[in-house]
Design a protein with these regions (language model features):
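Flexible helix-coil linker/hinge segments at domain or subdomain boundaries
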Residues: 9, 107-112, 227-234
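Non-catalytic, conformational "gating/processing" segments within enzyme and secreted inhibitor domains
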Residues: 13, 64-100
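M16 family metallopeptidases and their MPP-like homologs
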Residues: 1-3, 17-25, 30-58, 78-85, ...
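Peptidyl-prolyl cis-trans isomerase
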Residues: 7-8, 12-13, 61
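Glycine-centered hinge/linker elements that transmit conformational signals in sensory
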Residues: 96-110
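Short beta-strand/turn micro-motifs at beta-sheet edges
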Residues: 68-71, 127-131, 185-191
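Short, charged, amphipathic alpha-helices and their helix-cap/turn boundaries
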Residues: 58-64
Length: 281
């Protein structure tokens, strides 16, 4: 029925609009929203496809157009890929799949992704601004990005780098300096529309400590780039990754995500995982 007979409910849609409009209006009073907006605008240079939805946009929602778009997207199941994982009897499942999926509409439409040119800013960009808050704090966001081949080795190395920096910043920023409750470090490798890697570092601190902590953040980035990680930190991360991978292999959700990854990007996130982790310098 999701494909063939989506149910129109004008009352539910009106309720959805009212709830979201009220929530978005309340968000505007949160200083953190201004920070998030500034981060997005700085990275994506005010690209309209990265604009945050605001309360006034809710009134412009066209239910008829939404349903029309939905029906267009789901009128052709031929270009869909359905993935089933779990402890099932394959032979018993096949006729059920044939019955239910075989009855879905199909017009043999072939599609691919479109590059909407939502590119990240290149070069050095810095934006500082002040907003009045009940409790003074400095929110900090650092983003590094660049071209990077999309493969399992680079994905693992980026994950290792993120985790090692997390250990370093926990020791030097949180424990030694007492400057923050924690530093978030996250890395991401993407294939579409361009092969890119990004590393983001986020933390909050007292305004008086911001400058010193930022110096530590960049000094440790420079140190790991030039000298590499300590043997102790590297071994901790390797041990954790191997243990978690062994646990993940028992989960249906992990296999589902891995199959989806392979179909979408061609990268097999399971094959050679352990060998790459143990071999990484």
């Amino acid at each position: 029925l999701t494909f063939t007979a989506p149910r129109r409910d004008d009352d539910a849609f009106a309720s959805y609009k009212n709830r979201n409009k009220a929530a978005l209006q309340n968000m505007e009073m949160n200083p953190q929203v201004a920070f998030s907006d500034s981060v997005s605008a700085g990275i994506y240079m005010h690209h309209p496809r990265r604009a945050r939805i605001k309360a006034d946009m809710i009134d412009k929602m066209d239910y008829d157009k939404i349903l029309s778009m939905y029906q267009d997207r789901y009128k052709d199941a031929s270009d869909f890929t359905f993935i089933f994982v779990g402890n099932v009897n394959v032979e018993e499942m096949k006729p059920l799949i044939a019955e239910y999926l075989g009855s879905l509409p199909a017009i043999n439409r072939k599609e691919t992704f479109k590059d909407n040119k939502v590119d990240m800013r290149q070069g050095v960009y810095k934006n500082e601004f002040v907003r009045k808050q009940e409790t003074a704090k400095a929110s900090n966001f650092v983003l590094l990005n660049g071209d990077c081949k999309y493969d399992l080795k680079n994905d693992i190395l980026l994950s290792m780098t993120s985790q090692i920096l997390d250990l370093v910043y926990t020791a030097k920023v949180r424990e030694d300096e007492g400057g923050t409750y924690g530093v978030y470090v996250g890395g991401q490798l993407s294939k579409y529309p361009k092969e890119k890697a990004l590393l983001q570092i986020v933390f909050e601190t007292a305004p008086a400590k911001r400058e010193k902590l930022m110096q530590i953040i960049f000094a440790e980035l420079d140190n790991i780039a030039k000298a590499g990680p300590s043997e102790g930190d590297l071994n901790k991360v390797k041990e954790f990754m191997l243990k978690k991978h062994a646990e993940d292999l028992k989960e249906n959700s992990y296999w589902l995500g891995s199959i989806d990854e392979y179909l979408f990007t061609g990268m097999n996130p399971i094959k050679d995982y352990e060998q790459i982790v143990t071999a990484s310098p």
